[in-house]
Amino acid sequence: MLYIITPCSRPHNLQRIYQSMNFTKVDRWYIVYDTSKGRDYTFKYANHDKIIEMKHDEEGVCGHPQINRALDEIDENSDAFVYVLDDDNIIHYMFWILLPTLDSNYIYTWDQNRADKARFLKGGVIQKGRIDTAQFIVPRKYIGSIRWNPTERQADGQFIVDIHAKHHALFKYIPEIACFFNYLLAGSGA
Protein backbone atom coordinates (compact mmCIF):
# COMPACT_ATOMS: atom_id res chain seq x y z
CA MET A 1 0.00 0.00 0.00
CA LEU A 2 1.08 3.55 -0.71
CA TYR A 3 -0.18 6.79 0.77
CA ILE A 4 1.12 10.01 -0.75
CA ILE A 5 0.83 13.28 1.17
CA THR A 6 0.96 16.65 -0.57
CA PRO A 7 0.71 19.81 1.51
CA CYS A 8 -0.76 22.40 -0.83
CA SER A 9 -0.58 26.18 -1.13
CA ARG A 10 0.07 26.09 -4.90
CA PRO A 11 -3.01 24.39 -6.35
CA HIS A 12 -2.00 25.47 -9.87
CA ASN A 13 0.64 22.70 -9.70
CA LEU A 14 -1.78 19.90 -8.83
CA GLN A 15 -2.65 18.95 -12.41
CA ARG A 16 1.03 18.44 -13.29
CA ILE A 17 1.54 16.40 -10.10
CA TYR A 18 -1.57 14.38 -10.93
CA GLN A 19 -0.11 13.56 -14.35
CA SER A 20 2.98 12.07 -12.66
CA MET A 21 0.89 9.68 -10.55
CA ASN A 22 0.40 6.01 -11.31
CA PHE A 23 -2.94 5.44 -9.61
CA THR A 24 -2.73 1.67 -10.08
CA LYS A 25 0.00 1.81 -7.40
CA VAL A 26 -1.47 4.56 -5.18
CA ASP A 27 -3.97 3.70 -2.47
CA ARG A 28 -4.55 7.26 -1.26
CA TRP A 29 -3.27 10.67 -2.25
CA TYR A 30 -3.88 13.13 0.57
CA ILE A 31 -3.93 16.73 -0.62
CA VAL A 32 -4.00 18.98 2.43
CA TYR A 33 -4.68 22.61 1.58
CA ASP A 34 -3.02 25.22 3.78
CA THR A 35 -5.92 27.44 4.80
CA SER A 36 -3.97 29.37 7.43
CA LYS A 37 -3.85 33.17 7.14
CA GLY A 38 -7.38 33.26 5.73
CA ARG A 39 -6.58 31.32 2.56
CA ASP A 40 -9.17 29.09 0.98
CA TYR A 41 -9.13 26.63 -1.90
CA THR A 42 -11.65 24.78 -4.01
CA PHE A 43 -11.32 21.01 -4.06
CA LYS A 44 -10.29 19.78 -7.51
CA TYR A 45 -10.72 16.01 -7.21
CA ALA A 46 -13.86 15.50 -5.12
CA ASN A 47 -15.01 12.62 -7.34
CA HIS A 48 -11.73 10.68 -7.43
CA ASP A 49 -11.90 7.60 -5.20
CA LYS A 50 -8.15 7.58 -4.43
CA ILE A 51 -7.76 11.28 -3.62
CA ILE A 52 -8.67 12.73 -0.25
CA GLU A 53 -8.70 16.51 -0.13
CA MET A 54 -8.86 18.34 3.17
CA LYS A 55 -8.20 21.78 4.57
CA HIS A 56 -6.04 22.54 7.58
CA ASP A 57 -5.57 26.02 9.00
CA GLU A 58 -2.73 25.54 11.50
CA GLU A 59 0.02 28.07 10.81
CA GLY A 60 3.57 26.94 10.14
CA VAL A 61 6.13 26.84 7.34
CA CYS A 62 6.38 24.85 4.13
CA GLY A 63 3.16 22.90 4.71
CA HIS A 64 4.49 21.05 7.73
CA PRO A 65 1.27 21.30 9.80
CA GLN A 66 -0.62 19.99 6.77
CA ILE A 67 1.70 16.96 6.52
CA ASN A 68 1.10 16.23 10.20
CA ARG A 69 -2.66 16.47 9.63
CA ALA A 70 -2.50 13.78 6.94
CA LEU A 71 -0.24 11.57 9.08
CA ASP A 72 -2.90 11.68 11.78
CA GLU A 73 -5.43 10.29 9.28
CA ILE A 74 -3.41 7.13 8.56
CA ASP A 75 -3.59 4.17 10.95
CA GLU A 76 -0.34 4.27 12.91
CA ASN A 77 -0.03 0.47 12.81
CA SER A 78 -0.33 0.29 9.04
CA ASP A 79 2.29 -1.39 6.85
CA ALA A 80 1.44 1.12 4.12
CA PHE A 81 4.28 3.23 2.80
CA VAL A 82 4.03 6.97 3.36
CA TYR A 83 5.62 9.29 0.80
CA VAL A 84 5.56 13.07 1.09
CA LEU A 85 5.46 14.90 -2.23
CA ASP A 86 5.70 18.67 -2.04
CA ASP A 87 3.42 20.78 -4.22
CA ASP A 88 6.39 22.02 -6.25
CA ASN A 89 7.48 18.55 -7.30
CA ILE A 90 6.39 15.55 -9.38
CA ILE A 91 7.04 11.86 -9.01
CA HIS A 92 10.11 10.56 -10.83
CA TYR A 93 9.48 7.64 -13.22
CA MET A 94 12.06 5.50 -11.35
CA PHE A 95 9.96 5.75 -8.19
CA TRP A 96 7.25 3.67 -9.86
CA ILE A 97 9.81 1.09 -10.99
CA LEU A 98 11.31 0.74 -7.50
CA LEU A 99 8.02 0.75 -5.56
CA PRO A 100 6.99 -2.89 -6.24
CA THR A 101 10.42 -4.09 -5.08
CA LEU A 102 10.16 -2.45 -1.65
CA ASP A 103 9.48 -4.50 1.48
CA SER A 104 7.26 -2.85 4.10
CA ASN A 105 9.55 -4.13 6.84
CA TYR A 106 12.16 -1.55 5.80
CA ILE A 107 12.62 2.18 5.30
CA TYR A 108 14.20 3.36 2.06
CA THR A 109 16.20 6.30 0.77
CA TRP A 110 17.53 7.03 -2.74
CA ASP A 111 19.29 9.70 -4.74
CA GLN A 112 17.78 12.95 -5.96
CA ASN A 113 18.13 14.80 -9.26
CA ARG A 114 18.47 18.55 -8.72
CA ALA A 115 18.55 21.36 -11.24
CA ASP A 116 21.14 23.33 -9.27
CA LYS A 117 24.92 23.20 -9.45
CA ALA A 118 25.12 20.30 -6.98
CA ARG A 119 22.95 18.36 -9.45
CA PHE A 120 22.64 15.14 -7.42
CA LEU A 121 22.04 14.56 -3.73
CA LYS A 122 22.91 11.09 -2.46
CA GLY A 123 20.32 9.48 -0.22
CA GLY A 124 22.75 7.50 1.89
CA VAL A 125 23.57 10.37 4.27
CA ILE A 126 20.92 10.71 6.96
CA GLN A 127 21.65 14.19 8.28
CA LYS A 128 19.53 17.30 8.52
CA GLY A 129 20.30 19.44 5.47
CA ARG A 130 21.70 16.43 3.57
CA ILE A 131 18.47 14.57 2.80
CA ASP A 132 15.17 15.73 1.35
CA THR A 133 11.67 14.38 1.91
CA ALA A 134 11.41 13.19 -1.72
CA GLN A 135 14.35 10.82 -1.08
CA PHE A 136 12.56 8.89 1.65
CA ILE A 137 9.71 6.42 1.98
CA VAL A 138 8.64 4.86 5.27
CA PRO A 139 5.95 2.42 6.41
CA ARG A 140 3.48 4.27 8.65
CA LYS A 141 4.12 1.80 11.49
CA TYR A 142 7.68 3.16 11.88
CA ILE A 143 6.60 6.80 12.14
CA GLY A 144 4.65 6.36 15.37
CA SER A 145 4.15 9.73 17.05
CA ILE A 146 7.08 11.42 15.27
CA ARG A 147 5.88 14.56 13.48
CA TRP A 148 7.25 17.44 11.44
CA ASN A 149 8.13 20.56 13.42
CA PRO A 150 5.53 23.05 12.14
CA THR A 151 7.85 26.06 12.32
CA GLU A 152 11.22 24.63 11.22
CA ARG A 153 12.21 24.99 7.55
CA GLN A 154 14.33 21.81 7.51
CA ALA A 155 11.77 19.75 9.39
CA ASP A 156 11.85 17.09 6.67
CA GLY A 157 15.49 16.33 7.43
CA GLN A 158 14.83 16.31 11.17
CA PHE A 159 11.82 14.01 10.69
CA ILE A 160 14.00 11.55 8.76
CA VAL A 161 16.83 11.84 11.31
CA ASP A 162 14.38 11.16 14.16
CA ILE A 163 13.02 8.04 12.45
CA HIS A 164 16.59 6.92 11.68
CA ALA A 165 17.56 7.32 15.35
CA LYS A 166 14.72 5.00 16.32
CA HIS A 167 14.96 2.47 13.46
CA HIS A 168 18.48 2.81 11.98
CA ALA A 169 18.84 -0.94 11.37
CA LEU A 170 15.79 -0.86 9.07
CA PHE A 171 17.13 1.79 6.68
CA LYS A 172 18.13 0.67 3.20
CA TYR A 173 19.81 2.99 0.72
CA ILE A 174 19.09 2.45 -2.98
CA PRO A 175 21.83 4.08 -5.10
CA GLU A 176 19.41 5.12 -7.87
CA ILE A 177 17.97 8.50 -8.79
CA ALA A 178 14.28 8.11 -7.96
CA CYS A 179 13.14 11.66 -7.24
CA PHE A 180 13.42 15.29 -8.21
CA PHE A 181 13.94 18.42 -6.13
CA ASN A 182 11.48 21.29 -6.69
CA TYR A 183 10.87 20.09 -10.24
CA LEU A 184 8.02 22.49 -10.91
CA LEU A 185 9.94 25.48 -9.53
CA ALA A 186 13.01 24.60 -11.56
CA GLY A 187 11.04 24.89 -14.78
CA SER A 188 11.52 21.15 -15.39
CA GLY A 189 15.25 21.67 -15.76
CA ALA A 190 15.98 18.66 -13.58
How would you describe each model-predicted region?
Residues M21, Y33-K37, D87:
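Conserved short acidic donor-positioning loop in nucleotide-sugar-dependent glycosyltransferases
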Residues D79-I90:
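Short beta-strand-to-loop acidic/aromatic patch adjacent to the donor-nucleotide binding site
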